[in-house]
């Protein structure tokens, strides 16, 4: 019988761990539970004493000295959290290395360069006459007067600033051509409102097609195309062939690039600012009569166009003269070399400085 009996291992009392101590080691520190129906106040007290291993021990000291205050585990330590954040995201150090520009400024003792502020230009002030017409017969009479004035001029070319206005709606798009403004003399601008005009007067068509008249403006070709769509008595192609786009002409004379708006061209050539108020620009140009702001806006557009034309004409003459004088003194090879370096010859150059 003994061989069929298995010997059961006898547990040593020395290896036994008290139940309460084992539970205390495994359990994490916890907040005392709320009393339930099954727990008695005495049992709750025993459980708190058994599981609360994080309670700080009282330090030995003089009798009567209060024990250290217990930390609230539920409230995070703000100081520790700040230190942890600084360790994760250390503050960026400013590089002490000097670049080429900062080194030169440090040696010279000059302050660091500031961002250039845009130059404040004075606004255009037009003090000339504004002749405003709304009826077809009045427009015809005015255009005929200008036509006679053009024919009396001795010059072969009579520059005339030309511009148009029309209403625009984001729902319906651009409306019909409503205003034509012209300027042949900086002292007078003509504004023709076409709301009541079903067909352009013959005198106005003859004026803009006159062989001596050179119409000019910014993006003027698109104006002629729109005018021809709205009024079939106008043919766009002959007007486009003889007109002058001031932006393209500026690129040729000043050797600049890109597309120009009238506002930017005014800043660059005339050193003036334009008040391109959206309230006026997007206003109801077909409504009669135009108010003072609309009349001034329309007049300034062609007035400044005439000013820009005269200035570009003057610069072109200076440029041609300087180029010819330079070629005579230094030869074609030197002239080509200077052009390669980006010289515009808008100012006089006597000798080659390569």
Curated annotation (Swiss-Prot):
GO CC annotations, alphabetized: nucleus
One GO term (biological process): nucleobase-containing compound metabolic process
Cross-referenced InterPro entries: 3'-5'_exonuclease_dom, 3-5_Exonuclease_domain, RNaseH-like_sf, RNaseH_sf
Positions of the UniProt region annotated as Disordered: 1-120
Its biological purpose: Has exonuclease activity on both single-stranded and duplex templates bearing overhangs, but not blunt ended duplex DNA, and cleaves in a 3'-5' direction. Essential for the formation of DNA replication focal centers. Has an important role in maintaining genome stability.
Keywords, in A-Z order: Exonuclease, Hydrolase, Magnesium, Metal-binding, Nuclease, Nucleus, Phosphoprotein
Pfam families from the UniProt entry: DNA_pol_A_exo1
Amino-acid positions noted as binding Mg(2+) 1 in the UniProt annotation, renumbered to this chain: 163, 165, 301
Protein name from the UniProt record: 3'-5' exonuclease
Family annotation (Gene3D superfamilies): Ribonuclease H-like superfamily/Ribonuclease H
Keyword Magnesium: yes
Example of a GO MF term: 3'-5' exonuclease activity
Compositionally biased intervals (Basic residues): 59-70
Lineage: Eukaryota, Metazoa, Ecdysozoa, Arthropoda, Hexapoda
Organism: Drosophila simulans
